[in-house]
């Protein structure tokens, strides 16, 4: 294999640039040419492809977002769209593709694999919801962004003796909520993977207030429901002054943490190794700090699960 491509797809995550950098530099180290595909699968269809050199990825390891840009691409879900994408890959002489993104991006890589084009997926999403890896690129940075926000919210919550509901990202996965809630000392954590008892949450807030607690923090993953609605109900049933903070897209931005930069560098380089070994249709990950790879079809068939021991601990510590 003498020429490979790389693209970023779906929602951006901090560390994607570090992964792109690793792909480019690792490939060039092995005398393999690298082509960047801009705007994800949309750029693949539209032919927005250009050769990348070492200088192309200079000064990006510390930058959030993605140099290659990203976009949703409904057209790629069609057979015609995918065939057009492969046609463009062949036009540039590209023999393998590294896809950096989440489960939707992996689905695109799966479709290309089924058409006979070798792809390797690199998990890049702040949600940490890709099976087969302990961590995804961007999760640690997003987690630290949320923790920083919680710490600041706690300051004002204490000053005004208020209860705060903090809504974080996670439509189907509660890792951001769970990890940030545990690290931030939240009184309650609501995640999509676990049932919750609103009456118990209310009772817990009342108990805290009765023993002189000056503030409370409730973390809600967006997939559970609206933080605003939770805030209204809490205030109505407890008479505690309650405010809601929806963190939104700030969780996706910012300079990647050291952990995410190292993770992205390791996974990006490993993806290139697999392609050069002729192993397409794979996705890479890290488990117990060891690099691993899986059949991308198997990963897409699995469902993300939350760490039940960690969730249980969060419940035990929020008495």
Swiss-Prot record:
Residue sites binding substrate per the record: 125-127, 162, 169-171, 222, 243, 249-252
Protein name per Swiss-Prot or TrEMBL: ATP-dependent 6-phosphofructokinase
GO MF term list: 6-phosphofructokinase activity; AMP binding; ATP binding; fructose-6-phosphate binding; identical protein binding; metal ion binding; monosaccharide binding
CDD domains: Bacterial_PFK
Pfam family membership, one: PFK
Task of the protein: Catalyzes the phosphorylation of D-fructose 6-phosphate to fructose 1,6-bisphosphate by ATP, the first committing step of glycolysis.
Positions that bind Mg(2+): 103
Gene name tied to this protein: pfkA
The species this protein was found in: Bacillus pumilus (strain SAFR-032)
Cofactor(s) recorded in Swiss-Prot or TrEMBL: Mg(2+)
Enzyme Commission identifier(s): 2.7.1.11
Catalytic residues of the enzyme: 127 (proton acceptor)
Entry's localization field: Cytoplasm
Top-rank lineage group of the source organism: Bacteria
Residues noted as binding ATP in the record, renumbered to the chain: 11, 72-73, 102-105
Family: Belongs to the phosphofructokinase type A (PFKA) family. ATP-dependent PFK group I subfamily. Prokaryotic clade 'B1' sub-subfamily.
